[in-house]
Amino acid sequence: MADQQAGTIVGGVRDIDANANDLQVESLARFAVDEHNKNENLTLEYKRLLGAKTQVVAGTMHHLTVEVADGETNKVYEAKVLEKAWENLKQLESFNHLHDV
């Protein structure tokens, strides 16, 4: 199914406009790191958001590329956060190491 105004496919992953609600996206990135730390008993430190994409599913899936500090080593992870505003739900779906910086 296509969204004719935006020219995108519903359900497709699309880049988030860098100027669109930066604080909300950064908040989701920090949430992802905090949740991963809680789930894995780690102490990764959020450094910065490197990229963000979004996908409309049964809610919104945010695909976030984040840089974190793991002791003296900076690492890049891809996080997926599911958000369902009508259920007041925010859930970390995955948090995968991509590479060291």
Swiss-Prot record:
Q: Which residues form the Cystatin domain?
A: 11-99
Q: Which GO terms describe its cellular component?
A: cytosol; endoplasmic reticulum; plant-type vacuole; plasma membrane; plastid
Q: Where is this motif: Secondary area of contact?
A: 55-59
Cystine connections: none
The answer to keyword Phosphoprotein applying to this record is no
Q: Which GO terms describe its biological process?
A: cellular response to cold; cellular response to heat; cellular response to water deprivation; defense response; response to wounding
Q: What induces it?
A: By wounding, nitric oxide and infection by avirulent pathogen.
Q: In which tissues is it expressed?
A: Expressed in roots and developing siliques.
Q: Which residues carry this modification: N-acetylalanine?
A: A2
The record's keywords, sorted A to Z, are: Acetylation, Plant defense, Protease inhibitor, Thiol protease inhibitor
Signal peptide boundaries: none
Family matches, as SUPFAM superfamilies? Cystatin/monellin (SSF54403)
Free-text function comment from the UniProt entry: Involved in suppression of hypersensitive cell death activated by either avirulent pathogen or oxidative stress.
Tell me the protein's name.
Cysteine proteinase inhibitor 1
The species this protein was found in: Arabidopsis thaliana
